[in-house]
Swiss-Prot record:
Cofactor: Ni(2+)
Entry GO terms, CC: cytoplasm
Function: Asymmetrically hydrolyzes Ap4p to yield AMP and ATP.
Gene Ontology MF annotations: bis(5'-nucleosyl)-tetraphosphatase (asymmetrical) activity; nickel cation binding; phosphatase activity
Family, per entry: Belongs to the PrpE family.
CDD domains, per database record: MPP_Prp_like (cd07423)
Gene name per UniProt: prpE
Transmembrane domains' residue ranges: none
Name under which the protein is recorded: Bis(5'-nucleosyl)-tetraphosphatase PrpE [asymmetrical]
Taxonomic placement: Bacteria, Bacillati, Bacillota, Bacilli, Bacillales
Catalytic activity: P(1),P(4)-bis(5'-guanosyl) tetraphosphate + H2O = GMP + GTP + 2 H(+)
Length: 246
């Protein structure tokens, strides 16, 4: 099986449509389908900050749950939206407010449909995907070699948030260590979470979050070819979001 792994979309539907078209997918049926039987995989954070979060929920639900023709690994924004839909006490900020505004603008019956679709998508998707006979792992913020195969709380925190130190940047965002430099495994780890100006290959890891929602690009990785394909963002560039990893 060949895969096209998509970086953090954050509600940027137009960029997603442009990228999948560039990757050879047809939208004739209203969702991206590849005639060469390639499958999409998502590194999470499909919602928040961008203009079309609910559209992305519907598309990813259709591909992953209804058609079982794609893979989705939830991100930290997905986790927070899931908790919001469960009625938990979450702070509606850091991008969640845009998704909530879209959601609250819907009539109640459509709200229920979106809520049920996302809860199902989240609950039926693993923390990370191990694909291609264990040669490929798709996850949100990365994973250490010795964590692969585990599902405990420590691993969940790492996969959703990265190798956080507990310290904060001046803007309140967490300081993260560069775990990829220490990775010695043969399995390819494809992830996102931390915006970079260009896809970042370090050892057998690739960060494909090129900051579409911050005016960068939306990037996909063709696997096993290990070729990156990007489309430009239509949103304003926010340079401070593209900081060094550590």
């Amino acid at each position: 099986m060949k895969y096209d792994i998509i970086g953090d979309i954050h509600g940027c539907f137009q960029e997603f449509q442009d990228l999948t078209t560039k990757l050879g997918y047809s939208w004739d049926s209203g969702i991206p389908i590849h005639n060469a039987k390639r499958r999409l995989a998502f590194v999470g954070d499909i919602t928040d900050r961008g203009p079309h979060s609910l559209r992305m929920i519907e598309i990813v639900w259709e591909l992953v749950i209804n058609r079982k023709d794609a893979y989705y690994a939830p991100g930290n924004h997905c986790n927070k939206l899931y908790r919001f839909f469960l009625g938990r006490n979450v702070t509606i900020a850091h991008g969640l407010e845009t998704t909530v505004a879209e959601y609250e603008a819907l009539p109640s019956n459509k709200q229920q449909i979106i809520k049920e679709k996302f809860i199902t998508l989240y609950e039926q998707s693993p923390l990370y995907h191990i694909l291609d006979e264990k040669n490929l792992t798709v996850c949100h913020a990365g994973i250490r070699q010795d964590y692969i195969g585990r599902q405990d709380k420590k691993v969940q925190t790492f996969v959703l948030y990265g190798d956080i130190t507990g310290e904060k940047h001046p803007d309140g965002s967490p300081v993260r260590q560069d775990w990829a430099k220490e990775y010695k495994g043969e399995t390819w780890i494809v992830y996102g979470h931390t915006p970079v100006n260009e896809p970042r290959f370090v050892n057998h890891t690739v960060n494909i979050d090129t900051g579409a929602v911050f005016g960068g690009k939306l990037t996909g990785l063709r696997y096993p070819e290990l070729e990156t394909v990007s489309v430009p963002s239509s949103l304003p560039f926010v340079p401070e979001k593209f900081r060094p990893i550590s």
